[in-house]
A protein has these predicted regions:
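A charge-rich, low-complexity, intrinsically flexible signal that marks solvent-exposed coils, linkers
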Residues: 1-23, 29-59
Length: 59
């Protein structure tokens, strides 16, 4: 599900921004890192991959 979050953020906001969450914020750190792995991906591409993944998960 982190992949869905990252694709959504990349599609709606673009490349990751802000500081990485603190060491003990495990959820925040995981989200930040997942989003960061998509750096440079176009918003339209991220949105399409999001839709494709949702369709795959629903089937």
């Amino acid at each position: 599900l982190l992949r869905l979050y990252a694709l959504y953020k990349q599609g709606s906001e673009g490349d990751v921004s802000g500081e990485k969450p603190g060491f003990f914020d495990f959820v925040g750190t995981a989200k930040h890192e997942a989003w960061g792995k998509l750096k440079g991906m176009a918003g339209d591409e991220a949105m399409q991959k999001y839709v494709d993944l949702v369709k795959k998960l629903r089937s």
